Amino acid sequence: MNYAVKWEWNRHCDQSAGQKVKSGAPISSLSPYCPQLFAELTCSLQIGLQSADPAVAGGVGRTFDREDFRRKVMLLNDSGATFGFDLIYGLPDDTLARFREGLNFALSLYPNHLDIFPLAVLPGTAVGNKAASIGLQHLPEPPYTLQQSPSFPLADMAVARRLGAASDIFYSRGKAVAWFNGVARGLKLQPVELLEHFGDWLLAKQGRQCDEAEFDDAAIWQLQRAFLTQLFTERKLQKLLPAALDCVDYHYAYGVALMAVPPIPPDDEQLLQLDLLKMKLVRASSLTLLPFHYEILDILESGEPDLPWIAKHLKQSGSWAAIYPAHGEVCTESLIRPYYRLLEGLDGKQPSGQVAAKLKVPADDALELLQFALAEGMVTGW
């Protein structure tokens, strides 16, 4: 097997701070020590899977051992490394059924993202040289995209294109890796079927094929919520919906916090000198406040989402959480509702003590919360 891994990280040194560094190697060369190294770096690996079908891979001069590939990828998963797959549809002898099955396999390995695109029949390559003889019809000019083939007709290419767009929007841009397979199991669907349902739903909703560049992250989050609400309802699985939405909501907020730059908090000495109740504090832009159906910490502690288990064993007691970056990681604080509402009310327009008084939060309690929130970078304005 020779499926190349490409990686990129930010290299920090005196003369090249922030420089992007790219390199690559066959995935077969990954030792048990490499994944942990990748996990410790600011590094994203892109694995050129191309096709998960051994016969299709063999047609372009590759060998593919699924179990060996799975073992190597699980090393990456176990280490916490960030990685994605490149998948191509329309290779010689590829079919829509084979592509769907390969996508299902790829999703089962929990990649952080998937890049899916049609075959480019490049001149001078092995595939390009035999394209005419095996019936590959493609654009005559760059990017030489395959239009159809004997095994992958035009209509099937359109279906694969819609699947690729659904994956881009719902899975990759939607940062769904942590909950996607668990939600699919809760719906009693194969992962690829969940994407197909989303692609069909989005086409009906928008009236046309959409591209992920049309949506910002917040819009994709709302699309995920609306789609899943409808699908769980249609499949008469409403009792599992609250747990599914809690997972979707949390990981959206986690993704926001992961990319956010927190404010610089005061040091301990400065903090003690501030009269916080008289200050017009404001929520930091890096803070996300969200309500949940369940105690969100219980869901996080339960591991990969098992929606039936959550619905059966956990109580929908409700929780209110602050999700934010601090100390080089994403932090999650489960708050009592008055504290949540106090943070929610900090808009920088009125003294924080007035906000607390309106919510009937005792001044001493409010001060303790605000000191913690300011030290953690949840609020700013000092």
Where are these regions (language model features)?
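C-terminal accessory regions of radical SAM enzymes
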Residues: 132-259
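Conserved non-cysteine loop/helix-boundary elements of the Radical SAM core domain that shape
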Residues: 1-141, 146-152
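Extended hydrophobic-aromatic, low-complexity segments
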Residues: 46, 57, 85, 300, ...
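A generic secondary-structure signal for well-formed alpha-helical elements
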Residues: 80, 110, 118, 167-171, ...
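Short, polar/charged, Gly/Pro-enriched helix-capping and turn/loop motifs at alpha-helix termini
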Residues: 174-178, 303, 380
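Hydrophobic packing positions characteristic
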Residues: 209-329
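Long, charge-rich, low-complexity alpha-helical segments
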Residues: 241-267, 331-382
